[in-house]
């Protein structure tokens, strides 16, 4: 029997989501001075909350001020004022939705023109062929830096709860830092954080334990995990199953499944190797296997969070292209003791219902809600979206992919100004505008970071939130 899209979902923490539809994380790139949320994000999330989704997950909020995916990123660390975050949480929850903060560290996936640090499990850089120079070469993290970053995740989670958020989602997908440690292609360490999967998962598990130790039992803790990296010899569905098993006793409420990384952007429908999913014997490095011309844009070289839905090709999307991680998710749902959320390419109610029929508990959408923010309410009224993004037919796939994400951010900025989406926006205009805004944001971020004292190791661990 198919679970109804509009039935509630009770999580292990006791939290109840009003329905099975979630607004998945998309990096908004709208940080105000000081890398803080302002009235634009308040307006944007109030709009999404009124649109009928049971859960809103923010774009990835950075736990380390010196490590951002893009210059418009939000930072919530020990020094950030809470008032802007309180207003953000209150706006998202105003119509009854739960509001979770996605928290993340980019690791090696930092643009080369960004100040700060570029860290990874090893010194292996992002490989995108002729686009590789867009990213800096990472430094392999020390034991102290790993321990410090665990504490940073816990600090951000504790402060998110203090600000009024209902939960956090730890970003361990799309090739960001925790995902890098999980990947045998990126993590070549030979110490306690490398080698067997149990070691490669240690960082993530320590982060979850640290968060659970400082938040209240009723505060939701979720993990975003790749169902596969879609690179031969990389993290695969068998690994995902094992990690879910390791997470189960740690108090995790939900696992969101996606896939891919900057090198293989399956999260935007463009995996480097679609067959590289659950074959543990697959070898042959992913180096150079990614279609760099399709990768650079989805990689967020202008600040994307890793697209959570197909971008720039929405007009030609079919049922075959929708929910493109569903087969992997359905297999994992058969054995998972944790509720799963599936994100990637879902735009129609029929597809969402097909996802739920596979025993997945929650349906996540990103781009679809940037174009049609009230899509859940429309589905409740048996209506569908009436608009899709203008298709991009440029021969330069790299430029087309970057422009696709720019189109999505253009929609979010319009919503944040209380305007209606403009899905017909010309991609060239969206791209030019986006790059101009990112350039301004980079100058502002550089000035802000230069004024801050350099972050020290061994920051004081947060204490548990008391209610």
Predicted regions located by residue number:
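Flavin-dependent oxidoreductase catalytic cores
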Residues: 1-467
